[in-house]
Each structure stands twice: as C-alpha cells, then as structure tokens.
Amino acid sequence: MKLQVFWTGLEYTCRLLGIATAAVLIGVGTETFLRGRFKSLAFYLLFTGVTISVCEGTYFVAQLLAICFKCQPGSLAHRAKERAHWLGCFQKFLAYMLLSVACFLHPVLVWHVTIPGSMLIITGLAYFLLSKRKKKKAAPEVAPPTEQYTDPSSSVVSTTGSGDTEQTYTFHEAFKEGPGSFFIHMKSILKGTKKPRVLQTQDTLMELALEPADSLAKKKQVHFEDNVVRIIPSLTEGLGDSDSEPEETSSDTTPIIPPSQTPHFLPSLMATDLF
C-alpha cells in the first residue's frame, strides 16, 4: 500500500515538474526574444517550452475528461487513457536530457539558461525513476457463460459425403430408449420402421450407413408393394364371398329366345305363299 502511494505521488510530481519546466522555458524564451539580442536562443527556448507543455498537458486533459465522462473498461477510450498513463516515461527522460544539453552549450546569461537546463535534468531524472514502476497487467475479462443446450444422452459426429457416397452417423455414447429421444426418432426414420430396436450394449460405437437416394427410393417402393400385396387378399376374399351366392346356370345349347316367345305369324305367312 505504501509503495502504491509512493508511485502515485511520484507520478503527479513528474507531471507538475513538467508543467513548471515548460512555464519557465516559455518565460525565459519570451524575455530573451524581447531583448532582441539572442533571437535563435529565444526561439529554441520557446519551441522547447511549447513542446513540453503539450506533452504534459495531455495528461491533465485526459484526467479532466475521465472525471466528466466515464469510460467503460475495455473500451477504446479506456485503453487510450491507460496508454497515456504509462507510455513515454523513459522516452521523456531521454528527450529532456538532450534538450538540456543545448542550454549548457551556449550560456548567454547564467540565469537565462542554467535554470531551465537544470529543471529539464531534474524532470528527466524523475521520469526515469517513474519508468521503473511495474505496469499493472489488466485482468482478462471473463465472459459470462452462455446458455447452451446439450443433449445429455449422447454426442453425435456426422460425416456427410457428396454424390453417391455413403453418409455415416457416428454415436460415441449409447443413448437411452425413449419416445422423446431425437436420435431414436431419427434412427427410426432412416430405417423405415416405427419402433426402434432396443440397444444391447452401452458405450459402444454405432454407425448407421445410409445408401444413396435411388436405393432408398427402391426400398420405399418395395415396402409399398408389400402393403399392396397384403391388402389385395382381403379384396379377393370379399369378391369370393360375393361370388358364393347362388346364381342361375346356363348352358351353351339353350336357345337365346325361348320357344314360347316365337312369333305366331310365321305359319300364316307360309300358308299364304303356298296358295
């Protein structure tokens, strides 16, 4: 706990030192430029002060935005904020050290250059110490368990072929018989039966090989013909019962018109012809 407080205090100290150094550089550069004697040094000090103020000011802007707007963990804004906290400590140390060298190489006025250069060195050393802090590894977010329905009876691995190849359904675990079992229903449909067979052993590998569609269609046709054959005898039996009733028998020698129905006018015609 104490170590965490130390690192937090050091971080805020570095930020405040950076802002103070930028303010001193801008002030000294402005005064040097107003005197008009060393304009090149004045531009250098002003450029350095503005650069440091931009680098240090972004941290405070990020803190202000974090207070006004809540960033959800894992979002892009939250990752950018964490990166702004940790990125550039060692890089700032190197940059401040290099910027301070130019201040000591051309000491026009002791207080004009020595004070900004010294502040750059102190700020760089503070950032170097801050870079030794270990980064906190973000804890991986655990996704909530998704609701998933799994059939407790068995697991299915199916391999399907294309064209006229076979289709194999492999069941790695024996499943229980039951009217509501999806696999029993599928098996009964594939085999063309209504009542599935009782499995003899458990924890065995069972494969159901399906033949091509043509052969399956032939099997269905044969099954239909069997049913027809079973139905036809009942029809023939019914016809036989109806034929067993007494019927009038007739012979081939029986005349079509009975004798009693022969016309009586034929003898009279024959008699008239003779006379």
Curated annotation (Swiss-Prot):
Membrane-spanning ranges: 16-36, 41-61, 85-105, 108-128
Bias kind Low complexity: ranges: 153-162
Predominant subcellular localization, coarse grouping: membrane
Ranges annotated as biased composition (Acidic residues): 240-250
Keywords on record: Membrane, Transmembrane, Transmembrane helix
Presence of the UniProt keyword Kinase in the record: no
GO CC annotation terms, alphabetical: membrane
Source domain of life: Eukaryota
Location(s) in or outside the cell: Membrane
Region Disordered, annotated ranges: 139-162, 235-264
UniProt name for this protein: Transmembrane protein 72
Membrane topology: Multi-pass membrane protein
